[in-house]
Amino acid sequence: MYAATVGEVDGVRLISDQTMRNAIEIRSTGPDAVLVFDIPFGLGFMRNSDFAKLGSDSSFGHYGAGGSVGFADHEANIGFGYVMNKMDLGIAGDPRTAALIDAVYESL
């Protein structure tokens, strides 16, 4: 899904550039009501932060349970999704997730 927000996938693009820019504009900051960490949000999307590392400052997406994550980076033109067979027990900072994201950006 995230790949189709930054470009076409099999001829389909989910949102226009203008809609994407509108959706990822930071609309709120401060402690998240559930996670209690400072996380900037656009319209339904987490933005890159110290707590929710999504690759770069042009990334938008969302973390899920146990270290799963999905995001897009419109400047790097990538979509990324990761789910695992064994969930991490922490609320943030799964080293497997961080290592995969780092490897993607190192390969660009």
Model-derived segments and their meaning:
Residues 2-108:
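Catalytic loop of the DD-peptidase/beta-lactamase superfamily, centered on the K-T-G motif
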